[in-house]
Amino acid sequence: MKHLWLILFLVFISCYNNPTPPSEITGAQISGLQYERFDCDTLNDEIIFLENRERELMLAQENRIKESNRQQWWANGMGKGDGIESSELHRVKGEKLAALIVFQSKECN
């Protein structure tokens, strides 16, 4: 029985503080009002910037997952957890969606 509790504890703690995969990070609820004053060219530039930033943050989050997996090996299952990358990715995904909605509502091509 003692070994069972130890195994359950180790299984539980091995899941402790793992970073969230980028595919599971959703976009924040961002109002499109900040993009309403932009013309189509400026909106397009902003969307391109946000897409590039999203890619950078997804790579950073994937690297954090790899580092966390390496750390778990020697730190009794304790990972690095989510950092600033995940919260910024959450915000950037929401901003990109808001900009895309405004872009489509203005019927930009």
Question: What label would you give each PLM region?
Answer:
Residues M1-L8:
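Sec-dependent signal peptide recognition
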Residues K2, T26-Q29, K93-L97:
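Short, intrinsically disordered, charge-biased short linear motifs at domain edges
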Residues V11-S14:
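C-terminal motif of bacterial Sec signal peptides marking the signal peptidase cleavage site
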Residues Y16-P19:
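Bacterial signal peptide processing site
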Residues I25-N69:
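Post-signal-peptide N-terminal segment of Sec-exported extracytoplasmic proteins
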Residues E54, Q61-N109:
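Compact alpha-helical subdomains of small soluble proteins
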